[in-house]
UniProtKB/Swiss-Prot annotation:
Belongs to the ANKH family. It comes from the Eukaryota. It holds the Pfam family ANKH. Keywords: Membrane, Phosphate transport, Transmembrane, Transmembrane helix, Transport. Residues 1-85, 153-158, 211-327, 382-403, 453-492 are cytoplasmic. Its main location: membrane. The keyword Magnesium does not apply. This is Progressive ankylosis protein homolog. Regulates intra- and extracellular levels of inorganic pyrophosphate (PPi), probably functioning as PPi transporter. GO terms for biological process: phosphate ion transmembrane transport; regulation of bone mineralization. The chain crosses the membrane at residues 86-106, 132-152, 159-179, 190-210, 328-348, 361-381, 404-426, 430-452.
Length: 492
């Protein structure tokens, strides 16, 4: 009789990952709800969707790096003093982001970035800059939320983090429904998704901060003891954070770059506006079945026994590295299955777009091919997430920086080359994104192999030194040998 392996060690992983996965999917649902708030507007729905999509993707460029401060909270924050340093970093970053939002909205720089580079008309450009100004405070609220989310994850409160994100989405959906029946639909329809986004962000931030104060604040020391390396410095936090922030910034800037090249490829025509609208609609739907795989990178820092912080948070940890690898593979298989069921089963993807976002069926049919390309994203995303988590545990994130550069190079190369092969519109955008993901994951794998070999070589050297020390310890000292000789002589 074949004995099945015990599933007991996998339950902590499941309890940890499921709320995070739901969180990621909930964020995508929130984006779809916001898009529905635009699509439901009777007049100029495609133009409004394109304007909001451009502004939102640019805003995500600023919020992206801040969301990676979650990992700083997960790895570094062991005391109240560490938390204050992390919060201070995010306050400064939020202020800088708000200044950039204002500059882009009011200066010639914004006119050049949005109108000239994207080749959009005055109407779309004006609405995009206005929406971008309205979104100026979102990066700051996002930063506060993610910092406390990381601290909660360190102490295994992933359920609370998931609840906060679901509450965010529920608030967005409710307020979109309410505002669609207000005078805003006629006077300023752009404010419908933007105000709903603010309400949701406020709910999430408040939930996470209250959760921190209720469950963790009184339990952690004022400062970190020497057994976990003492207090983390701002320099250490930023050194750990900047490669992750660079990677996420390049991921988030990828969408604006894609919008830019797709729009320019079609010459700023009506077809270009339609293509950007298709990308705006397909991003959250395509991202939903695989986006949660990114959360796998939080598993290693939370569960690996070599991480001193995780030892404090979970002393009786039954999860081994093999369990983490097996669970990662299972997550990838599940994501691939979801992608192919949702995007390759006839009429399923169209129904999602029509029922959830509220677009018409003809527009939904134009989204089918881009969505099918999203089916291949789970493989590179899983590889990247798993290896990034391992490198975070070792605090070797600096080796990840080249992967972000390669991603942008591959992305732009694809956006330039593919039109010569007859690929245009939203298909060009999503196909180039896939190429960028593959390039980035390949570089992460190479960086991980480099670190692994260095770690192995270092371990072998240490073992050799310990072996020599042990051999020397086993031999009697010179004084002991002399005593033995003297005893023998007396005996004779």
């Amino acid at each position: 009789m074949v004995k099945l392996p015990s599933l007991t060690p996998y339950w902590p992983l499941i309890r940890f990952l499921v709320p995070l996965g739901i969180t990621n999917i909930a964020i995508d649902f929130g984006e779809q709800a916001l898009n529905r708030g635009i699509a439901a507007v009777k007049e100029d729905a495609i133009e409004m969707l394109a304007s909001y999509g451009l502004a939102y993707s640019l805003m995500k460029f600023f919020t992206g790096p801040m969301s990676d401060f979650k990992n700083v909270g997960l790895v570094f924050v062991n005391s109240k003093r560490d938390r204050m340093k992390a919060v201070l970093c995010m306050v400064v970053a939020g202020i800088i982001a708000a200044v950039f939002h204002t500059l882009i909205a009011y200066s010639d720089l914004g006119y050049y970035i949005i109108n000239k580079l994207h080749h959009v008309d005055e109407s779309v450009g004006g609405k995009t800059r206005k929406a971008f100004l309205y979104l100026a405070a979102v990066p700051f609220m996002d930063a506060m939320a993610w910092t406390h989310a990381g601290i909660l994850l360190k102490h295994k409160y992933s359920f609370l983090v998931g609840c906060a994100s679901i509450s965010d989405v529920i608030a967005q959906v409710v307020f979109v429904a309410i505002l669609l029946h207000s005078h805003l639909e006629c006077r300023e329809p752009l404010l419908i998704p933007i105000l709903s986004l603010y309400i949701g962000a406020l709910v999430r931030c408040t939930t996470l901060c209250l959760g921190y104060y209720k469950n963790i604040h009184d339990k952690i020391p004022e400062s970190s003891g020497p057994e976990i390396g003492g207090d983390a410095t701002i320099k250490k936090m930023l050194s750990f954070w900047w490669p992750l922030a660079l990677i996420l910034a390049t991921q988030r800037i990828s969408r604006p770059i894609v919008n830019l090249f797709v729009s320019r490829d079609l010459g700023g025509s009506t077809a270009a506006t339609e293509a950007v609208a298709i990308l705006t609609a397909t991003y959250p739907v395509g991202h939903m079945p695989y986006g949660w795989l990114t959360e796998i990178r939080a598993v290693y820092p939370a569960f690996d026994k070599s991480n001193p912080g995780s030892k404090l948070a979970n002393s009786s940890n039954p999860v081994s590295k093999t369990h983490i690898k097996n669970x990662t593979f299972a997550c990838m298989a599940l994501s691939l299955t979801l992608c192919f069921v949702m995007f390759w089963t006839p009429n399923v993807s169209e129904k999602i777009l029509v029922d959830i976002i509220g677009v018409d069926f003809a527009f939904a049919e134009l989204c089918v091919i881009p969505l099918r390309i999203f089916s291949f994203f789970p493989v590179p995303v899983t590889v990247r997430a798993h290896l990034t988590g391992w490198l975070m545990t070792l605090k070797k994130t600096f080796v990840l920086a080249p992967s972000s550069i390669l991603r942008i190079i591959v992305l732009i190369s694809s956006l330039i080359v593919l039109p010569y092969l007859g690929v245009h519109g939203a298909t060009l955008g999503v196909g180039s994104l896939l190429a960028g993901f593959v390039g980035e994951s390949t570089m992460v794998a190479i960086a991980s192999l480099y670190v692994y070999r260095k770690q192995k070589k270092k371990s072998e050297t240490e073992n050799a030194v310990e072996g020599e020390d042990s051999a020397m310890t086993d031999l009697p000292h010179n004084e002991e040998l002399t005593d033995i000789v003297e005893i023998k002589e007396d005996g004779e």
